């Protein structure tokens, strides 16, 4: 357990309005502050899960969201509630020492991690904490050394994967890798990114640098990835999906009592060692449930930038989405709820909804200014 950051009444708290909140740097939204928690190694025990559930109810509006970066975030936190929330979570080793350490510890770990992967993630976290690398807020690492990578489609800039004979280090956007001798190699690749101008203006991603034709030394073929699994039984336990990635506090408590939890970037939780999960509010265990085809941000009024309500609309359209397809309903053109292309995207505008086919929320629309009543006819 680390020492809790000392936040006192009247202390200045850095509040951001962009896409990258933290626990120590919350984000202002339409329903209050958003506080994002990064569980160490992507793991939660029952006490930690209970503390998060308690904090959501005591200091927020009770909403807990699973993010696409395998974190959790609490919504509806009032400014006066932030300090006691941080203190409560610090008692369970869920808070970093300061904002800089929190920002650097952006590590995505495969939920199917074994002891080797856990040790790698811990060593990488320690090396990042000891470094002074001025990495952009979204710059992240993926520890994915299983027999087959499962995180290749998920956000990371530097990836640790397994080749035929040894661990590999790969820059995102390149299909060639280099041997990994230690986590110091991962930090060296991050320094290379900075030295090559990848973070001009304090922003930047590895894939964007690679797209400019700047590439690190790498000659080994990267392993072929597999798509992420759906909810249900896996060798390590049970994967539990949540509608729109939102987990009710008591569901989080109950799941954690059934086994240690592993975070995923797929808005699911892995309950380690479980062979059966009882029905719980918000839980989706059927891999063909139509709600799994939906992506939607919180929408209005939770987000001040959203121009329409999103999730009830998405639910009403779920049965119209073919199996294997994705419908994304976005409250604005930023597309926070799903940064990827979707088979159909509905983007709210001041004139109604725009329909984008096989694209993202800000892409050119096939139809514009649609009323919600028109949507079932055009999907």
Task: List each model region and its residues.
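Small-residue-enriched alpha-helical segments and adjacent helix-cap loops
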Residues: 2-13, 29-170, 175-180, 184, ...
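Short, solvent-exposed coil/turn linker segments
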Residues: 78, 178-181, 201-209, 213, ...
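Terminal amphipathic helices with adjacent charged low-complexity linkers/tails
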Residues: 81, 198-227
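Flexible helix-coil linker/hinge segments at domain or subdomain boundaries
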Residues: 97-101, 194-203, 372-379
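Phosphate/diphosphate-binding glycine-rich loops and adjacent basic-rich segments that engage nucleotide
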Residues: 161, 167-170, 219-236
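Internal alpha/beta scaffold segment
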Residues: 173-201
